[in-house]
């Protein structure tokens, strides 16, 4: 199984993958804060048809301009109306994220410090959700999943885990921007396609695509590569889409 996963990883994880994937958007920026913001925003709308995701992301980042970080801290986002961006994600949702980011950057300086201050990824996700709510008068967003309490069931947090994969793992596809969090601590961004492929390969037994399934699959993949289990996200994607 490891040999098969490695072969697919080498096949899929190449620079040619970048223009076909939402990861292309954070690759367009150089400033740390821009890359962080764009990673979380692009991952947040990464559901549905890939071509529509890319089109919607182009629309969203046209709104945020050359520096999404400047767009946030200048308060420029307050001029947004409430036009649709992607499926159930509207300009009001983008404003929510901008207010949350503004709070997080004022408190932590960068988002890496926010996540690195937690004991593990799940607690980091929970803290991110809490801090984003604090920037929005205590209101939670349906677009930021609830990881639940430690060791208990909760959302798979696919889109947050995807953003974290981009920011933590080294290239050529992922960004490797964050150095204080190790790839070994990441969890698989579990979508329906990856889950289906994992079950076919007997790597995942749990029927629900939730937090417990993410932990189960990541632990199975960790047996093949303890230092970087989430690399096989590319393998499972490739097997599911291309084979």
Regions found by a protein language model. Name each.
Residues 1-243:
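HhH-family (HhH-GPD) DNA N-glycosylase catalytic core used in base-excision repair
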């Amino acid at each position: 199984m490891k040999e098969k996963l490695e072969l697919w990883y080498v096949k899929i994880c190449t620079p040619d993958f970048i223009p076909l994937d939402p990861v292309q958007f954070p690759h367009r920026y150089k400033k740390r804060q821009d890359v962080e913001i764009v990673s979380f925003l692009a991952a947040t709308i990464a559901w549905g048809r890939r071509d529509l995701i890319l089109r919607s992301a182009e629309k969203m980042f046209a709104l945020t301009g050359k520096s999404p970080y400047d767009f946030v801290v200048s308060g420029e986002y307050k001029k947004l109306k409430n036009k649709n961006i992607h499926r159930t994600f509207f300009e009001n949702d983008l404003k929510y994220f901008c207010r949350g980011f503004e709070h997080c950057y004022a408190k932590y300086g960068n988002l890496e410090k926010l996540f690195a201050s937690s004991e593990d990824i799940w607690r980091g996700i929970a803290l991110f959700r809490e801090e984003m709510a604090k920037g929005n008068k205590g209101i939670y967003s349906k677009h930021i999943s609830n990881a639940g309490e430690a060791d208990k069931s909760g959302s798979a947090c696919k889109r947050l885990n995807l953003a974290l994969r981009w920011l933590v793992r080294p290239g050529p596809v992922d960004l490797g921007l964050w150095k204080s969090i190790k790839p070994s601590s990441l969890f698989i961004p579990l979508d329906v396609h990856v889950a289906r492929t994992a079950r076919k390969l007997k790597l995942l037994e749990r029927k629900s695509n939730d937090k417990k399934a993410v932990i189960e699959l990541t632990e199975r993949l960790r047996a093949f590569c303890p230092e970087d289990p989430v690399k096989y996200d590319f393998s499972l994607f490739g097997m599911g889409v291309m084979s």
